[in-house]
């Protein structure tokens, strides 16, 4: 147990799927898993462990932003000995070639955040951290098997949701970042630090280019494909 997770060690599987919203974790568990059990509810950050195609998997929310996912992913990897975390979330498109509902496999994440430095991770000069190559390849293979189109590349991991400095977003576009989100860089930093595996997969919910946005009811339906993709991946990793 930790100050933020009260599950017993054996209650958490070695592969954890992490949406930002704990209610989305609940939805995935109830919709797709057999016999899901609530194993954490500290601070409302729900976690469920259950079976998918006979394999034990945990689904847990991580909250919003680098500090939040930094805490939860670190504690899962460090104290619960989780081997793999796959973040499944939403993002804002930074390139005009991306459409709403597009799937992104975030092979790389760039951020101006100091989180990785504070954790003692050796950050390269370009401030880009990598997802686990094995997970990137597994995501692509599984997406192809499910006939899901996807984009693979760099995402910009932002600290401020209500970003005022437009030059930062312009710089992200110049770096050819596909989209902006708020957690991948910290997740990859923790995986590097603790020698674990991590990947972020995202669905485009908004566009900072066209200013289009998915209504709430469509976001849930679109998220379904990514949830199934992540579960199929997890079942191959356990």
From Swiss-Prot:
Enzyme class: transferase
Binding site for phosphate: 20, 24, 43, 87-90
Keywords (A to Z) from UniProt: Glycosyltransferase, Transferase
Active site: 206 (proton donor)
A single Gene Ontology CC term: cytosol
Single GO biological process annotation from the record: purine nucleoside catabolic process
EC number(s) reported in the record: 2.4.2.1
InterPro entries, per database record: DeoD-type, Nucleoside_phosphorylase_CS, Nucleoside_phosphorylase_d, Nucleoside_phosphorylase_sf
Catalytic activity: a purine D-ribonucleoside + phosphate = a purine nucleobase + alpha-D-ribose 1-phosphate; a purine 2'-deoxy-D-ribonucleoside + phosphate = a purine nucleobase + 2-deoxy-alpha-D-ribose 1-phosphate
Single GO MF descriptor: purine-nucleoside phosphorylase activity
Record site feature (Important for catalytic activity), residues: 219
Keyword Repeat in annotation: no
Pfam families: PNP_UDP_1
Binding site for a purine D-ribonucleoside: 4, 181-183, 205-206
HAMAP family membership: Pur_nucleosid_phosp (MF_01627)
Similarity comment: family membership: Belongs to the PNP/UDP phosphorylase family.
NCBIfam families to which the protein is assigned, alphabetical: deoD (TIGR00107), PRK05819.1 (NF004489)
Cited function: Catalyzes the reversible phosphorolytic breakdown of the N-glycosidic bond in the beta-(deoxy)ribonucleoside molecules, with the formation of the corresponding free purine bases and pentose-1-phosphate.
Quaternary structure note: Homohexamer; trimer of homodimers.
Protein's UniProt name: Purine nucleoside phosphorylase DeoD-type
Highest classification ranks of the organism: Bacteria, Bacillati, Mycoplasmatota, Mycoplasmoidales, Mycoplasmoidaceae
Gene: deoD
């Amino acid at each position: 147990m930790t100050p933020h997770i009260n599950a017993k060690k054996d209650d958490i599987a070695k592969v954890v799927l992490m949406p930002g919203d704990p209610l989305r974790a609940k939805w995935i568990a109830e919709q797709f898993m057999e016999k899901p059990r609530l194993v954490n509810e500290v601070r409302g950050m729900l976690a469920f462990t259950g079976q998918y195609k006979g394999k034990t998997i945990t689904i847990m929310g991580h909250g919003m932003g680098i500090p939040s996912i930094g805490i939860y992913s670190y504690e899962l990897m460090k104290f619960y000995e989780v081997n793999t975390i796959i973040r499944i979330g939403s993002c804002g498109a930074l390139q005009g070639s991306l459409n709403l509902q597009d799937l992104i496999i975030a092979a790389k994440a760039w951020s101006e955040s100091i989180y990785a430095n504070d954790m003692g991770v050796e950050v390269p000069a370009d401030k880009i951290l990598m997802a686990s190559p094995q997970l990137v390849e597994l995501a692509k293979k599984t997406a192809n098997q499910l006939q899901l189109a996807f984009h693979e590349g760099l995402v910009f991991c932002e600290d401020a949701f209500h970003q005022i400095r437009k030059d930062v977003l312009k710089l992200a576009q110049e770096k050819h970042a596909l989209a902006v989100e708020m957690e991948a860089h910290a997740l990859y930093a923790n995986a590097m630090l603790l020698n674990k595996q991590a990947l972020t997969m995202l669905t485009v919910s908004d566009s900072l280019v066209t200013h289009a946005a998915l209504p709430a009811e469509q976001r849930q339906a679109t998220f379904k494909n990514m949830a199934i993709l992540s579960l199929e991946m997890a079942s191959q990793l356990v």
